[in-house]
Amino acid sequence: MTSLRRGIALSVLGLAGLYTVAVADEPKFKGTVLDQVPLGGLNGDYIMKVTMLDMEPGAQIPEHTHKGPGLRYVIEGAITIAWKGRSTETFKAGSTYFEAAGSNHPIGQMSARNAADGRTRVLIFELDPKE
């Protein structure tokens, strides 16, 4: 875990942006982009985006999509994912899961919610096409 934290700390060179979604008095969730790095050696131009997802108790992320595939690492709490055509899965602190654009994560076919009594934090690594 120490090497993971050290690696994350070294890769976090600047805050590239952030987003927050909330409706009325619903619990909030916020994703903060920690870094974006151009990647070579792939067909096309891609960036690796690292985002910290911070979810308040009871927060829900509506159906959505991502531009590219990515690995998720649950740092704290638990997140329940409703996958397309499958039952839900809950991932607790210390576990990982993978989301791939178009397969288990088509547009409007996946949602998430904080499954913990407290705050949930998920580190998201995404491989996105460069715009």
Region spans (language model):
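Short acidic-glycine-tyrosine-enriched beta hairpin
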Residues: 55-56, 85-104
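Ligand-binding loop in jelly-roll beta-barrel domains
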Residues: 88, 101-131
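Bacterial N-terminal signal peptides that target proteins for export
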Residues: 1-9
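Extracellular/periplasmic catalytic domains that process cell-envelope and extracellular macromolecules
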Residues: 45, 65, 73, 90, ...
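A short glycine-rich, His/Asp/Glu-containing loop-to-beta-strand
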Residues: 28-62, 120, 125
